[in-house]
Swiss-Prot record:
This is Lysozyme. Its EC number is 3.2.1.17. Gene3D superfamilies: 1.10.530.10. Lysozymes have primarily a bacteriolytic function; those in tissues and body fluids are associated with the monocyte-macrophage system and enhance the activity of immunoagents. GO terms for molecular function: lysozyme activity. InterPro entries: Glyco_hydro_22, Glyco_hydro_22_CS, Glyco_hydro_22_lys, Lysozyme-like_dom_sf. It comes from Galleria mellonella. The active site is at E32, D50. Signal peptide: none annotated.
Length: 121
């Protein structure tokens, strides 16, 4: 699934993301995955890969085998579904530990920069 900006805003609200940080999350998602749930990134320098809407990394957060594991206790394929419940829960866990600094897409394109306008959503 590819989310439009407003679909994304509505989905994130449904998942209980903090309204005050919503523009940051939208910016992050638009820069990390272009709003796509099914995206698997090219291998990173350390050989790890990033999965799904939030581009969550398999080095620490999800297991790339069929057995759920790592810090989010999920398989990486669970991050690629159209239902973003599991991905959202894991993204919040990453955020809780590292803030938005965990995501290069946010650091490079959103930090101290104009954030997307979601006022029409």
């Amino acid at each position: 699934k590819t989310f439009t900006r407003c679909e994304l805003v509505q989905a994130l609200r449904r998942q209980g993301f903090d309204e005050a940080k919503l523009r940051d999350w939208v910016c992050l998602v638009e820069n990390e995955s272009r709003g796509r749930t099914d995206i698997v990134g090219k291998p990173n320098k350390n050989g790890s890969r990033d999965y799904g809407l939030f581009q969550i990394n398999d080095k620490y957060w999800c297991s790339n085998t069929s057995k759920a594991g790592k810090d989010c206790n999920i398989t990486c394929s669970q991050l690629l579904t159209d239902d973003i419940t599991v991905a959202s829960k894991c993204a919040k866990k990453v955020y809780k530990r590292h803030n938005f600094m965990a995501w290069y897409g946010w650091r490079n394109h959103c930090q101290n920069k104009p954030l997307p306008d979601i006022s029409k959503c």
